[in-house]
Design a protein with these regions (language model features):
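Membrane-proximal intracellular helices of multi-pass ion channels
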Residues: 1-312
Length: 312
């Protein structure tokens, strides 16, 4: 019980400042990180030819679908020809047609249905350039759509999909994934480009131990509420989730951004109806508190039901 209370307390402590930070990003207000990320964003806009300006809902939706379609095509091709690409120390061949299609669609839609064992089915290049890349972009696409939806409900213009996607990746997902990745490495999660290691067991037989850029994938997998994993058994393997602390880190990572979106939504609605006398911004706004409370009640009810199922 103490462990559960500790994780939930840490979640509440982290989710409010994270939600306020995302609120400032969603409403294009100044943040403490602007000095670092503004030049990065401008460089990306210049390279990609992204122009500012608000979009209609049709333009926003079309941009989302088109961008994701292009990434699906590129990712599919990489999976098919991974055997000829770099960063393939274990000599893994190209993925079969239908499995490539299933994999790329699954990870682009944030469904993350995985019908392959990552340690034997994907090269490091495919893991990084397809799976990890899609975990970033699918999550960013979802959060961009969420931001646009919240803006619409609060009476604002929808914004620009490409600008939203870039800002979410550079200002939210990448920094958090870097921090979480370092924390997982400190707990024993591998992060290497070396090939598999062959060791002799205590029984006198030999076994291949799969390695790779595991921490990089695990960090964004949980932050972006993705599924799957670097290994076929996902986070039940010691390398993906080696300690109790890594388990807490991964649970908090999964909960952080979805909870922060509720805080962001509440603050955006509060802005639309606040009185001029209001000086101090609330923690999450009245609507945000209602939604957050409803989610907490459902969480407790479902947890009780799940506990009863396990005991029976």
């Amino acid at each position: 019980m103490l462990q559960i209370i500790l994780v939930l307390a840490m979640f509440v402590i982290l989710v409010i400042p994270m939600g306020r930070y995302m609120y400032h990003i969603a409403t294009d207000q100044k943040t403490f990180a602007d000095r670092v990320f503004d030049p990065v964003d401008r460089l990306i806009y210049k390279i990609c030819g992204i122009k500012g300006g608000d979009m209609s809902w049709k333009e926003y939706a079309l941009s989302l679908v088109t961008a994701n379609a292009v990434m699906i095509l590129v990712g599919y091709l990489i999976l098919r020809i991974q055997g000829f690409l770099f960063l393939n120390p274990n000599g893994i061949g190209g993925m079969e047609e239908s499995l490539s299609f299933n994999t790329i669609i699954s990870f682009m839609t944030n469904t993350n249905l995985q019908h392959y064992a990552g340690e034997s089915g994907l090269s490091y290049a495919a893991q990084m350039c397809v799976i990890i890349f899609m975990m970033f972009t699918s999550a960013a696409s979802g959060y961009a759509a969420c931001m646009a939806f919240c803006r619409g409900l609060s009476g604002r213009k929808l914004g620009n999909f490409f600008a939203d996607m870039v800002r979410i990746i550079t200002r939210v997902l990448l920094p958090l994934a870097f921090i979480v990745g370092l924390l997982l490495i400190s707990q024993g999660t591998p992060q290497t480009l070396a090939g598999n290691i062959t060791v002799e067991t205590i029984e006198g037989t030999y076994q291949d131990i799969a390695m790779g850029p595991v921490a990089a994938l695990e960090s964004i997998k949980h932050l972006g509420t993705n599924g799957g994993g670097f290994f076929g058994a996902n986070s039940s393997t010691p390398f993906e989730n080696p300690t109790v602390i890594s388990n807490m880190i991964e649970m908090l990572s999964m909960m952080l951004l979805p909870g922060a979106c509720v805080v962001t939504f509440g603050l955006m609605l509060h802005d639309r109806k606040k009185e001029k006398k209001t000086v101090r911004k609330p923690l999450m706004g009245r609507q945000g508190a209602v939604i957050f409370g409803a989610m907490a009640i459902l969480f407790v009810i479902r947890s009780e039901e799940h506990t009863s199922e396990l005991q029976s």
